[in-house]
Amino acid sequence: GVEFHNGKTMTSEDVIASYNHHMGEDSGSAASGLLTAVKSLTADGKNRVIFELESANADFPFIVSDYHISIRPAGDMTSGVGTGGYILQSFDPGVKSVLKRNPNYWKEGRAHFDEVELISIIDPTARQNALMNGEIDAMDRVDLKTINLFKRNPDINIMDITGTAHYTFPMRLSVDPF
């Protein structure tokens, strides 16, 4: 099973409580607008949740995997306890977060580092310089205009990773030839 950072086993009750939190009027969750089509949530045993939607939604698998939707222990939506590979040690908004490896992480072969420090560097040039100078070990959201500069540096590895982002192509199907 999947364990929370506090050792509690995650159950369908936790999933339902978390989604209800994200859908709540007062939650402030960035995901609340994504979940408006959820009509009800029902536990079907300890490890299964049934989502009833207002109507069919082909994007629903993408919606429920949105990074804003964190699953927390029922009754504890604010402490930061989760199920991820790293446990939050400190958080200074807009400055940095420090995380340590979760020794009970449920995905084997992951969470390789003992500790991770996430530093907020807003300025793109400062971020690029920090990577080039070895002040940071990794960065995301590389500016495509400067990616070739990084590719020329033998000490920098560019990783292109597939995500859940997708593009739609809306078409008006009510007129010919459709």
Predicted regions and their residues:
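Alpha-to-beta junction loops
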Residues: 15, 47-49, 132-141, 156
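Ligand-site clamp/hinge motif
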Residues: 1, 104-149, 164, 177
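Alpha-helical secondary-structure segments
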Residues: 11-18, 50, 84-85, 112-115, ...
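Ligand-binding "clamshell"
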Residues: 148-160
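Gly/Pro-rich hinge or "lid" segments in bacterial periplasmic/extracellular proteins
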Residues: 57, 62-117, 123-125
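Surface-exposed binding/hinge segments that line
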Residues: 10, 31-74
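Aromatic- and charge-enriched surface segment that lines or borders ligand/interaction sites
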Residues: 1-28, 50, 130
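Solvent-exposed coil/turn segments that connect beta secondary-structure elements
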Residues: 1-2, 15, 46, 54-58, ...
